[in-house]
């Protein structure tokens, strides 16, 4: 069974905690019923702050440094591959990257660049292919050598921000007993760092499996 710790991407702005809890619960109930509420979605944006905003990640098309990062790290390399024929086997992708920069910039406007975030450490040491780079591949806890079963199984539970910090504390407590190596201390330390980083900033995760 797979598992990703999908980070809660928003939290309540100070003073709006109760309303935030009400709105998020109402939206969750509506989604379960296949319904939508644009008004509630808009209100949620106003009373919440994103994880990206919290760590100071700049935005493509809005902040110059993020725009240049997108040009140099995404657009220019991909367009060079397209012109060199490396994308000939994927004609739609080739056509996509051969478009003018301004056109693609408009489509990606507002995209956050975590690599340039003011506060470093938010990206996961291990991430799944179906989630974002800030979501931790929780399934890897199953492969930490010597980790007791109770702490492994807890990975499959949703965690609030406070619970993330507590989980990290308990994992850190057993870290000295874990063997060295990429499937030992290194892997567990990555999980601890991720839990502490986001939990201490007010963000929890939901277990997606």
PLM regions with names:
Residues 1-201, 208-209:
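Acidic (Asp/Glu-rich) sequence patches and key acidic residues
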């Amino acid at each position: 069974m797979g598992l990703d710790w999908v980070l809660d991407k928003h939290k309540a702005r100070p003073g709006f905690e109760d309303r935030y809890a009400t709105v998020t619960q109402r939206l969750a109930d509506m989604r379960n019923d296949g319904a939508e509420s644009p008004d509630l979605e808009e209100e949620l944006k106003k009373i919440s702050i994103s994880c990206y905003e919290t760590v100071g990640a700049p935005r493509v098309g809005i902040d110059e440094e993020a725009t240049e990062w997108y040009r140099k790290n995404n657009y220019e390399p991909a367009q060079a591959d397209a012109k060199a024929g490396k994308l000939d086997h994927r004609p739609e992708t080739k056509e996509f990257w051969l478009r003018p920069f301004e056109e693609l910039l408009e489509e990606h406007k507002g995209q956050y660049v975590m690599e340039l975030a003011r506060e470093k450490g938010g990206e996961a040491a291990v991430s799944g292919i179906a989630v974002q780079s800030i979501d931790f591949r929780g399934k890897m806890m199953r492969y930490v050598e010597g980790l007791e079963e109770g702490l492994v199984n807890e990975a499959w539970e949703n965690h609030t921000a406070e619970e993330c910090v507590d989980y990290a504390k308990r994992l850190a407590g057993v870290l000295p007993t874990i063997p060295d190596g990429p499937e030992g201390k290194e892997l567990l330390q990555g999980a601890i760092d991720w839990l502490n980083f986001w939990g201490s900033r007010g963000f929890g995760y939901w277990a997606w499996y």
